[in-house]
Design a protein with these regions (language model features):
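Residue-level preference for long, well-ordered alpha-helices that form the structural scaffold
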Residues: 1, 5-8, 91, 95
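Short, contiguous alpha-helical
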Residues: 6-20, 28-82, 126-175
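A generic structural signal for well-ordered alpha-helical segments enriched in polar/charged residues
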Residues: 14, 18-21, 25, 101-108, ...
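Acidic/histidine-rich alpha-helical segments that form the ligand environment
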Residues: 80-124, 132-153
Length: 175
């Protein structure tokens, strides 16, 4: 199970890196322009993925409190800050830096897990408390689906702008 999740989170990190590279080539105005998506701009979608990854990791952290290596992997997240609204160029650079920190923390966290950790109960605060917890492996699947979904939104917007991309799927580079 660990090998599978490592493949997915490494692919996630690679896709985020490539997307950040594409978005960095846009003007700040183009990156921040309201594109009529739920999170408005390309920057907003990118930051939503980063922020949700940090949020999911906070849930995962609470599920494995006795795994010191997993806890250590998430320590860099303490440096994170939420960047809201339209960003300046300098803030965008910070958002990209945060994305790299979050993606590395996620890979390191998965590397630190043992087989029983994947069954650890993760407390969730949605679905009206039913169920109150789900296994960590399930939440990891939800994370992967979530990030792929939003990368797909970014990809669709980039397509409409005639910017070459294909980063909503899995890369075979990791095989």
């Amino acid at each position: 199970m660990k090998k599978i999740f490592l493949t997915f989170v490494k692919a996630n990190a690679e896709a985020n890196k490539v997307i950040a590279g594409i978005l960095e080539k846009l003007s700040n105005d183009d990156r921040e322009k309201d594109r009529k998506s739920y999170f408005k701009s390309l920057s907003g979608l990118f930051r939503h993925n980063t922020g949700c990854t940090a949020y999911f990791l906070s849930l995962y952290k609470a599920a494995v409190p006795d795994n010191a290596e997993a806890q250590k992997a998430l320590a860099p997240l303490a440096k994170m800050e939420e960047l809201k609204g339209k960003l300046t160029e300098e803030q965008w650079k910070k958002a990209v830096s945060f994305s790299k920190i979050v993606d590395k923390a996620l890979v390191d966290f998965i590397n630190a897990l043992n087989d029983t950790d994947f069954e650890a109960p993760v407390t969730i605060d949605w679905y009206k408390g039913k169920p109150p917890t789900v296994p960590l492996w399930f939440m990891l699947e939800q994370f992967i689906a979530h990030n792929t979904h939003h990368r797909g939104q970014i990809s669709q917007i980039l397509d409409s702008l005639k910017i070459d991309n294909d980063y909503s799927g899995i890369s075979v580079k990791l095989l």
